[in-house]
């Protein structure tokens, strides 16, 4: 009986704890974060151990949240008038002005023509595009339009964009011969 008790103590004392939280100043395996209560004068930091899986999950969650916020924000401007060179909801938007306005409102400052925006981020296959990614349209000589992906499934892709004919609107580009024939590529400027 004593040996069974000794074995139980030995097993439990050597088991790694999954909820270990360490604080310290010099641990190189720990992640450094500003304490939520810190100010410019108060430079205290908290340290806690994180696994790479936890970090990747947190980053993915934050990226997904930003993507959702961008799409929901863009949809709110549905019906806003088109204006060539327009960059605000009060005066109206052109396609690149609308895209720049939405992304800047969410902490990703971008501006410029569709051609300039196409040079940002990482190009992706059509099938890999996620909500919040940008899609570009035109012909072999020129990029003429940019839109924000609202949803992308195996069956259809919807975008939010500002068009000359209707201002800000949502379009299913999968069922549109016009948009399909002009589709060039997509770009991810959210993931880092």
Show where each model-derived region lies.
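Aromatic- and glycine-rich peptidoglycan recognition patches
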Residues: 15-37, 150-192
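Structural motif
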Residues: 132-133, 148
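C-terminal motif of bacterial Sec signal peptides marking the signal peptidase cleavage site
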Residues: 10-13
